[in-house]
């Protein structure tokens, strides 16, 4: 697209946080025709009965007025419920630990929002994510953000060529302290606002309380693989593989961890020791594969992978089983690989794509107890 910046309309998703505020400021300073959109994805009130979305939208209004750009609020609650929240509940019901942020980016921020932006005459959408897009060798590549500590390509792993061709990440070359400083210098209302944490629709609330509103808890037995009962669990959906806190097992010796789930018998398996071999897998079957590139993949190739956000890169060999499934062979056993989570593939700074962890093996044996 050879338009000049002032002829190029960029619709930016604004959350009311400092990152998207500075991203909007940068686009405006670069001369683009910028429109701010606040996405209302969840009908939400906090413990005090305050609608947090209203507070966030008020921050968006204030920042947009400061920058001098128009703004709108768009309601995506139905799409979010259908595409993200239903998936979230289904995964927990199946005893897995989902990653709703990946699905939200795929289905809402870079699909429903992108379609809405194009209807507004947008040439591009932008967000405050820490990632980069580059056009090289005839296609779009997604690269890690320069700030290693904040890089968000893990959550963006399902984006396609079509989506990336319409996307700008203004913060990709910056580090978080620089962004805070820019917000402060510009006097933005969100300059000192703390970063949001946790799953977007739960916010700061207690996860267990939230989930119990939608899924009936089924308490059961907590035991070792040899059958020694160590207590009761509150419901398998509340525990993730490798979890230490909340088990309530006293006594001396090494701490206890959740090492597996038996859905049929509603048993939570536990064992002692952070480095317990029951927590380590060296082979993974992953499904719902999405590649950033449209180029045909080799049947087998080496790269690195992250099995959770902020994990170090692990050397792996990826084998293509079919267009929806890959087998991942790890050079070294990896702790607490969790079904339902995303595995994301990298070649240096380039994010190649990702998939959903489905089955975990150790030395050729499926870890059935992972549920």
Curated annotation (Swiss-Prot):
Keywords: ATP-binding, Cytoplasm, Disulfide bond, Nucleotide-binding, RNA-binding, Transferase, tRNA processing, tRNA-binding. It catalyses: S-sulfanyl-L-cysteinyl-[protein] + uridine(34) in tRNA + AH2 + ATP = 2-thiouridine(34) in tRNA + L-cysteinyl-[protein] + A + AMP + diphosphate + H(+). Residues 150-152, 308-309 are annotated as: Interaction with tRNA. ATP binds at residues 13-20, 39, 128. The gene is mnmA. Disulfide bonds join 104-200. NCBIfam families: PRK00143.1 (NF001138), trmU (TIGR00420). One of its GO terms (molecular function) is tRNA-uridine 2-sulfurtransferase activity. The active site is at 104 (nucleophile), 200 (cysteine persulfide intermediate). Its EC number is 2.8.1.13. Its main location: cytoplasm. The record marks 129, 341 as: Interaction with tRNA. The lineage of its organism: Bacteria, Bacillati, Bacillota, Bacilli, Bacillales. It comes from Bacillus anthracis. This is tRNA-specific 2-thiouridylase MnmA. It is found in: Cytoplasm. HAMAP family: tRNA_thiouridyl_MnmA. The keyword Cytoplasm applies. GO terms for cellular component: cytoplasm. GO terms for biological process: tRNA wobble position uridine thiolation. Residues 99-101 are annotated as: Interaction with target base in tRNA. Belongs to the MnmA/TRMU family.
């Amino acid at each position: 697209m050879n338009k000049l910046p002032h002829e190029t309309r960029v619709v930016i998703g604004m959350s009311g946080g400092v990152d998207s505020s500075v991203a909007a400021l940068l686009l405006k300073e670069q001369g683009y025709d910028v429109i701010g959109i606040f996405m209302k994805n969840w009908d939400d009130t906090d413990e005090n009965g305050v609608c947090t979305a209203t507070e966030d939208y008020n921050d968006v209004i204030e920042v947009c007025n400061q920058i001098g750009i128009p703004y709108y609020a768009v309601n995506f609650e139905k799409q979010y419920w259908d595409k993200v929240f239903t998936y979230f509940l289904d995964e927990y019901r199946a005893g897995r630990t989902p990653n709703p942020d990946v699905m939200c980016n795929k289905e809402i921020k870079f699909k429903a929002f992108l379609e809405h932006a194009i209807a507004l005459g947008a040439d591009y959408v932008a967000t405050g994510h820490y990632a980069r897009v580059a056009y090289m060798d005839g296609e779009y590549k997604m690269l890690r953000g320069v700030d290693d500590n904040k890089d968000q390509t893990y959550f963006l792993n399902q984006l396609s060529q079509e989506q990336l061709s319409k996307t700008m990440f203004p913060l990709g070359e910056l580090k978080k302290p620089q962004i805070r400083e820019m917000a402060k210098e510009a006097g933005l209302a969100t300059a000192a606002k703390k970063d949001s944490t946790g799953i977007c629709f739960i916010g700061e609330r207690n996860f267990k309380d939230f989930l119990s509103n939608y899924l009936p808890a089924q308490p059961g037995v907590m035991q070792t693989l040899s059958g020694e009962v160590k207590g009761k669990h509150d419901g398998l959906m509340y525990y993730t593989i490798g979890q230490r806190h909340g088990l309530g097992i006293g006594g001396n010796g090494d701490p206890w961890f959740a090492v597996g789930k038996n859905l049929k018998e509603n048993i939570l398996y536990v064992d002692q020791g952070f480095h317990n071999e029951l927590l380590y897998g060296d082979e993974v079957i992953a499904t719902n594969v999405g590649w950033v590139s449209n180029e045909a993949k080799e049947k087998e190739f080496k790269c690195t992978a992250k099995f959770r956000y902020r994990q170090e890169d692990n050397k792996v060999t990826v084998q293509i089983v079919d267009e929806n499934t890959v087998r991942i062979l790890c050079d070294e056993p990896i702790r607490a690989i969790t079904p339902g989570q995303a595995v994301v593939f990298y070649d240096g700074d380039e994010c190649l794509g990702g998939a959903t962890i489905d089955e975990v093996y150790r030395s050729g044996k499926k870890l059935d107890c992972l549920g």
